[in-house]
Amino acid sequence: MGHLTLKDAVFLTITSIVGGGIFVLSPLTYLLFGKSIIWGWALLIFVSLIMASPFAYASTKISESGGVYKFVMKILGREIGVFSAYILWLSGVFALSGVVSFFEIVFNTKFNVSYVGLCLIVILTALILGGLRIVGNFVRIFGILTITIILYIVFSNGIKIDSIGEFNLKNAILTIYFGLWTATGWEGITMPLSAFKNQKAIAYGLLVGTFIIGVLYLLFSLTIVSLNVKTNNLDEILKILIGDNLFLLAGMLLIISSCAFSVLFTLSYMPYGMGKDRIFPKAFIKLRKEIPYYGVILNTLLVIILLIFDAKTLVDMSMFSTLIAYFLLYLAVFKESSGKIKAISLISMLITGLLILFRVYNFIIL
C-alpha cells in the first residue's frame, strides 16, 4: 500500500521536471533569440497548464501503475497503446540521459572530472533501491530545496524589467518548443500510481506543481536576460551566473540531481506496467521494498549507454518523441471526454501537432 500524499505529488512534479534543463536551455534560448525570449517563457506557463490538464484527467481514469499509456490503450486500442508505451518509455530514458548530461556540463564549469554523470546515476540508483519510504523522504527534501535555490539564484543576481525585448512570434514559438523540454514530464507523475494513498492527489499535485514550475522558470529567465552578457558561449554564461559562488554551484547540482532522482524513480514504473500488460517480461512486475527494481536497473543501464551522445542530441530525441506520445494521449482524452476537458485536449492536440510540424520544418530547412 503506497504512502505518498498530495504534498508529495506536488514535490514529485517539481523535482521530476525542474532539473538541469532550465540552467542550460534558458541561457541557450537567450543565445539563440535574444531578450525576446521572456515572452516565450511567460506564454509557456499557460501552454504548460493547458497541456498538463489532460494528464491530470487521464490519471483519474487508470487503476494501476504504469502511466497514461494505459488510458491510450483503453481508448485507442492495444496496438496504439503499445506504441504509446514504448515511445513514452524511450522519451523518458532520453530525457533522463539529458538531465545526467546537464549535470556533467554544470559540474565541469568549475571542475574537470570524467564520468561524473556515471557516478551520479549509480548513486541515485542505490538510493532508490533502498525503498519507497526513502524515496518519499528525499522527494520532500529535494522539492523544498529546489524552490529555495532557484529563488536564491534569482534574487542574488537580480531582475531588470527594462531588459525585456520586443515580442517576436517566431522567437516566442521556438522558445516554447525548447522550453517545453524542461517544462514537460507530466507522464512521470502518473506512473507510480500504487505509491499514492489517494489517486486524485496525482491530478491535483500535477497542476499545482506545473504552475509553480512555470513561475520559477520565468523568474530565472528574467535573471538571465538581466545579466545582459555579450558572449555566444553557453559555458561563459553559466560561469557568469555562478561566479565564484561554490554554494550556488552546489545548489544547481543538487537541483539537477533531484530531477534525475525523481525521473529514475517514476520511470521505473513503466517497465513494471508494461510487464503487467505483457509488453515486457513478467520479471519486471516484481517489487522489492515497494520499488520495481528491475525497471530501475534497466533504465540505469540504458542511461549509461546513452551518455555517449551530447546534451543537444538527447534533448532533441526526447522532445520529439515526447510530443508524439503526448499527441496520442490528447487524442485519447478528446475521444473519451466531454465538456471543458474535451476542448482543452483539442487545444493541447493542436499545440502539440503544430510544434511537431514546426520542428520538422525547421529540421528540413536547417
Curated annotation (Swiss-Prot):
Q: Transmembrane region positions?
A: 14-34, 37-57, 87-107, 111-131, 141-161, 173-193, 205-225, 247-267, 291-311, 314-334, 346-366
This protein's record includes keyword Membrane? yes
**Keyword set for this entry?**
Amino-acid transport, Cell membrane, Membrane, Transmembrane, Transmembrane helix, Transport
> What is the predominant subcellular site recorded for this chain?
membrane
Q: Does the keyword Ion transport apply?
A: no
Localization per record: Cell membrane
Any one cellular-component term (Gene Ontology): plasma membrane
In this record, what's one Pfam family? AA_permease_2
List, alphabetically, the InterPro entries matched: AA/rel_permease1, APC_superfamily, Na/Ala_symport
Gene3D superfamilies to which the protein is assigned, alphabetical: Amino acid/polyamine transporter I (1.20.1740.10)
Look up the domain of life of the source: Archaea
> What's its membrane topology?
Multi-pass membrane protein
The UniProt GO MF terms for this protein read: amino acid:sodium symporter activity
Which family is this sequence assigned to?
Belongs to the amino acid-polyamine-organocation (APC) superfamily.
This chain belongs to which protein, by name?
Answer: Putative amino-acid transporter MJ1196
Please name the source species. Answer: Methanocaldococcus jannaschii (strain ATCC 43067 / DSM 2661 / JAL-1 / JCM 10045 / NBRC 100440) (Methanococcus jannaschii)
